[in-house]
Amino acid sequence: MSNTTLHATTIYAVRHNGKAAMAGDGQVTLGQQVIMKQTARKVRRLYEGKVLAGFAGSVADAFTLFEKFETKLQQFSGNLERAAVELAQEWRGDKQLRQLEAMLIVMDKDAILVVSGTGEVIAPDDDLIAIGSGGNYALSAGRALKHHASHLSAEEMAYESLKVAADICVFTNDNIVVETL
């Protein structure tokens, strides 16, 4: 990403004990040195509140993808997988979309999917996933919590996983927003 690109950082999603939660931090960074905003909201409810979506990457690019994904959700009556696959196909086939520098996590009560910057749709094996600069930290923390602290709720796991990422990654802050289904 260029030094003048605004980008956002860490999103984590988990399904646990019949509940789903997605967490995102609030930091938006300009280039590699300047924090432009600390209270951005990168996790959103879509399709009558039945779908959660979160982004990491270029803010402008992510909003473009949000809009396109929401259109696909409406077109396919809230079918998450179909909407994600159709978005990915459009993403791969459109020269302008292929230039976008963002990733999405989308989820409903039944599935979690990552729509990657190359137009791939990936379903995690273990009902949790993270993206962005702090994604590996959040994913590691989330796996540990899921395996060794299964008494926690999905919401608590999402929050604590993001908190660990914020403690380690300079591009992730602790202004954490968690949405649940």
UniProtKB/Swiss-Prot annotation:
GO molecular-function term, one example from the UniProt record: metal ion binding
GO CC term (a single one): HslUV protease complex
Enzyme class at the top of the EC tree: hydrolase
Function text: Protease subunit of a proteasome-like degradation complex believed to be a general protein degrading machinery.
Active site per database record: T9
Reactions catalysed: ATP-dependent cleavage of peptide bonds with broad specificity
Keyword Transcription set for record: no
Activity regulation, short description: Allosterically activated by HslU binding.
PROSITE patterns: PROTEASOME_BETA_2
Single GO BP term: proteolysis involved in protein catabolic process
Residues involved in Na(+) binding: A166, C169, T172
Subcellular location: Cytoplasm
Name under which the protein is recorded: ATP-dependent protease subunit HslV
Gene name linked to the record: hslV
Assembly, per entry: A double ring-shaped homohexamer of HslV is capped on each side by a ring-shaped HslU homohexamer. The assembly of the HslU/HslV complex is dependent on binding of ATP.
Disulfide bonds: none
Domain of life: Bacteria
Family from the record: Belongs to the peptidase T1B family. HslV subfamily.
E.C. code: 3.4.25.2
